[in-house]
Amino acid sequence: MQFDNIDSALMALKNGETIIVVDDENRENEGDLVAVTEWMNDNTINFMAKEARGLICAPVSKDIAQRLDLVQMVDDNSDIFGTQFTVSIDHVDTTTGISAYERTLTAKKLIDPSSEAKDFNRPGHLFPLVAQDKGVLARNGHTEAAVDLAKLTGAKPAGVICEIMNDDGTMAKGQDLQNFKEKHQLKMITIDDLIEYRKKLEPEIEFKAKVKMPTDFGTFDMYGFKATYTDEEIVVLTKGAIRQHENVRLHSACLTGDIFHSQRCDCGAQLESSMKYINEHGGMIIYLPQEGRGIGLLNKLRAYELIEQGYDTVTANLALGFDEDLRDYHIAAQILKYFNIEHINLLSNNPSKFEGLKQYGIDIAERIEVIVPETVHNHDYMVTKKIKMGHLI
């Protein structure tokens, strides 16, 4: 498929056009027509109903939903993607509410600041969806994409979306979407590209605190940051004056290894080795909340159960439905840029960290090997990291 850039899509939306938004291939892997409510024209919903044929919904911000008392359709949402459907509505000035004109009127009234809850009949023929406050950075769905796109065009936070179906009633994917794009001369973007666009446009970290932190390995400055859109907390240890070319360790949090000194892995030993090195040579340790290579603590324990049954650290993650490594280093790159660090000597044995930082514009001048002893308990783990994950150990 041939995708357009986000800026061109925003321009099209602001001109009242409809675009195609495609989600992740591991999610629905489908394309929705998306329009911004404030900019859409009288033909938008008719075009969606005639050409796309899916369910026409109206994503809105939480503020709009709360102001108009748009309560959830069900108390117990069992949708596999957690889509926040509210009760369906028609504006009181409609008749049956189903015509394209009347659904357009209902959608437009959703963003009218003079509208009140009593102005909408329930149930109706338009289906509002409530977007997460942090948009696609919190949930990579079409609901959040529509509201984010509306905001990025300077419009009120609401849109209209409709799944694209083929003539035979199946969902349009891949080449079907490309053909639809070409037939109707529409812009087409991905939610992944929208996520990256927002990451580049908006600050993702917020400085919260700085303290002196005496440790068994020396006294460090400890900085606390908060990830703006995920609310994750990130700790940074530094030693000495921060330089533009700095020694840096990215360390993924490992409760079992770092705190309980588990010998299943080498994480705790790597952290101690890195703290000793940074204390002696100066530099920085960025402590990232990426437990279990991004799958979380409880899922890591589930992976350990599988390892006890004969799986290795890679196949266990795959068996649980995860990639072998879910980590992303964009937040780490943001922190480095916060400190004006342009070049780093990276303390790591993991090549994916090099590539992960390079894609966000961080220059890695040198790799510093982190040497830790192997134990009888982590031998198989170390072998798997070397053979299957390419670690330089």
UniProtKB/Swiss-Prot annotation:
Assigned GO CC terms: cytosol
UniProt keywords, alphabetically: GTP-binding, Hydrolase, Lyase, Magnesium, Manganese, Metal-binding, Multifunctional enzyme, Nucleotide-binding, Riboflavin biosynthesis, Zinc
CDD domains recorded: GTP_cyclohydro2 (cd00641)
UniProt cofactor(s): Mg(2+); Mn(2+); Zn(2+)
Pfam families: DHBP_synthase (PF00926), GTP_cyclohydro2 (PF00925)
Binding site for Mg(2+) 1: E28
Lineage top rank: taxon: Bacteria
Matching SUPFAM superfamilies: RibA-like, YrdC/RibB
Binding-site residues, D-ribulose 5-phosphate: R27, E28, D32, R139, N140, G141, H142, T143, E163
NCBIfam families: PRK00393.1 (NF001591), ribA (TIGR00505), ribB (TIGR00506)
HAMAP family tied to this protein: RibA, RibB, RibBA
Name by which UniProt lists this protein: Riboflavin biosynthesis protein RibBA
Gene that encodes the chain: ribBA
